[in-house]
Structure formats: structure tokens, C-alpha cells
Amino acid sequence: VGGMVQSAKVFNQDRDRVLALFPRLGERLDSLAGNLSGGEQQMLAIGRALMTRPRLIMIDELSLGLMPKVIDLCYEALLKLRDEGMTIFLVEQNTERVLQVADDICVLESGNTVWQGSAADARDNPQLTEAYLGMH
């Protein structure tokens, strides 16, 4: 019984952490995943991954198909996780967002690394930002 109580306690702590990151999910706790919006499903996927208390989280195309407000909420959560010391492996085409949350960046082209360095170095490299990051 003690283990079950501890497990429930840990589960509740983890759930509360996820709901603090994504308060919008708190309103939908009784909903089936299929009845959630695309943004809520993305938040749920991240929250579900966080329930295992990982040190690393991998996210692919977070902003794809989401409304700007939902993208903002998701990236605010990523910033909090980063500030807590979590390693985030993010595959994203939205360069502005990558530069917002990344410490280090690796630019790939056709599966090959064409540039690797800090986000600050990426911002300060006009050839890189124009050629690969789509920024002028």
C-alpha cells in the first residue's frame, strides 16, 4: 500500500507540473485525446512525455499546423523546461522560435551538418542566417 500511495503522490506532482505548464489542459481532463484541438493534442503529447521525468525531450515540428497563440503557449513551456535544466532536442523550421529557445544549433542539409554552433553565433552570421535560416 505504501508504494501505491507514493506512486499516486508522485503522479499527482507530475500531473500538477504538466498542468502548470499547460493550464489549458486542466479544463479538458475528462476529454478523450481525439476530442482535443490540434494544439491541445500537442500539449498533451509533451505533457505525457514529461510524466516520465525525462532529462531529455525530443520534439519534432512543434509549430506545424498550430495557431500562433498555441505556438506561443508551447514555446513558453519549452522556455520554462529549458530554464529548469532540461535538454530539448528540437527539430523546427521556424527559425525565429529556434533562436528563441536554443543554446546550440545544428543546421542540416540533405542529412549533412552544414553548420553547428551557438544560437548567438548563428544570429551574428549573416551568410548562415540568409542561406540556411531564411532570415535577412
Sequence positions of predicted segments:
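A short, surface-exposed alpha-helical micro-motif characterized by mixed small hydrophobic
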Residues: 98-100
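Conserved ABC ATPase signature
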Residues: 32-36, 40
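ABC ATPase C-loop
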Residues: 49-50
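Short, glycine/charged-rich "phosphate-handling" switch motifs in NTP-dependent
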Residues: 104, 116
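Helical segment within the ABC ATPase nucleotide-binding domain
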Residues: 71-84
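Conserved catalytic motifs of ABC-family nucleotide-binding domains
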Residues: 53
